[in-house]
Amino acid sequence: MSYRKQRETKETAIDIRMDLNDNQASSINTGVGFLDHMLTLFSFHSGINLQINVQGDTEVDDHHTTEDIGIVLGQLLLEAIKDKQSFTRYGAFYIPMDETLARVVTDISGRPYLSFNAEFSKEKVGTFDTELVEEFFRGLVINARLTTHIDLIRGGNTHHEIEAIFKAFARSLKIALSDDGSKGVPSSKGVIE
């Protein structure tokens, strides 16, 4: 099933199409090269096809673009989760990226919460401010109503640190979204909102 959302503010114009069942190559153009790279990795490792086109005020900096993409992706994920008939709910994954190690644990709980425990080795990767990684995930997690714990266990090269986090999140989400074969909501309450 395909989901699409367009969002326009005075800072960004975002158009994202997301498909959980389409293994075609994604097309990602955010205007922020490093973010394009991370979202391409996220798409590949989660199995979620993304078509992203963004016009943002990157002449100011990359903050609005990065945060707003996280918000829209979270909103699209929430729509997809509500439509799923069966899913595992929980996912956890470790990713080693050479010298770095990241762990991400995700619960499709309906209770939005992000624990972000990562201190990056440097403040920038190229022109990308590393503090924006947390802003991206906060926007995504809160809007998708996930409970997610992100931990950078071992650091090293800053690019590797961030890449390990994006890949671990993608894999944990893929597990949480996977069909567990049961019918109904994976909660003893009978509902996840």
Swiss-Prot record:
It catalyses: D-erythro-1-(imidazol-4-yl)glycerol 3-phosphate = 3-(imidazol-4-yl)-2-oxopropyl phosphate + H2O. InterPro entries: IGPD_sf (IPR038494), ImidazoleglycerolP_deHydtase (IPR000807), ImidazoleglycerP_deHydtase_CS (IPR020565), Ribosomal_Su5_D2-typ_SF (IPR020568). One of its GO terms (cellular component) is cytoplasm. Keywords: Amino-acid biosynthesis, Cytoplasm, Histidine biosynthesis, Lyase. One of its GO terms (biological process) is L-histidine biosynthetic process. Pathway: Amino-acid biosynthesis; L-histidine biosynthesis; L-histidine from 5-phospho-alpha-D-ribose 1-diphosphate: step 6/9. It comes from the Bacteria. It is found in: Cytoplasm. One of its GO terms (molecular function) is imidazoleglycerol-phosphate dehydratase activity. Its EC number is 4.2.1.19. Belongs to the imidazoleglycerol-phosphate dehydratase family. This is Imidazoleglycerol-phosphate dehydratase. It comes from Staphylococcus carnosus (strain TM300).
